[in-house]
Amino acid sequence: MDVFLTHGCILFALRCCILSSNLVSSYALADINRLKSEGLDIRAAVASRTDEPHWARFCMDHLVVEDGSTLSSCFGNLVEISYNDKTHHFRQLHKKTGIPFEHMVFFDNEHWNIKQVSKLGVKCIYTPDGMMKKHWEEAKTEFGL
């Protein structure tokens, strides 16, 4: 599941990690909460390609982040879960947020997704071993955060 985060006209994407049966932990989510507390307008969104969208939503409703909220509650209406490819998800998120593709960053562990999404003008970061702190820091630096 890919998570997209917006800061003004910037859209970030990261991969969450599950540490235990239902606790989701991510330094990036913690960092986002910190940036929000500093007054930055940051919104989060999810894009997931699956043939089981109902199951993915069920999981999001039951996974809990470190502050006790569900994963679903972190993203509001910015959830794109379907069998469509990532470019469809990005187009839908663009429609919902108005954020230009050129102001987006996308992390993914599949070359195909990186190749396709980059054609939209999105900055893509390949994460073969999953989202790591260095990837998050690279994206923040890229956008001056």
Provide a role label for each language-model segment.
Residues M1-N84:
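Alpha-helical substrate-recognition element adjacent to the catalytic core
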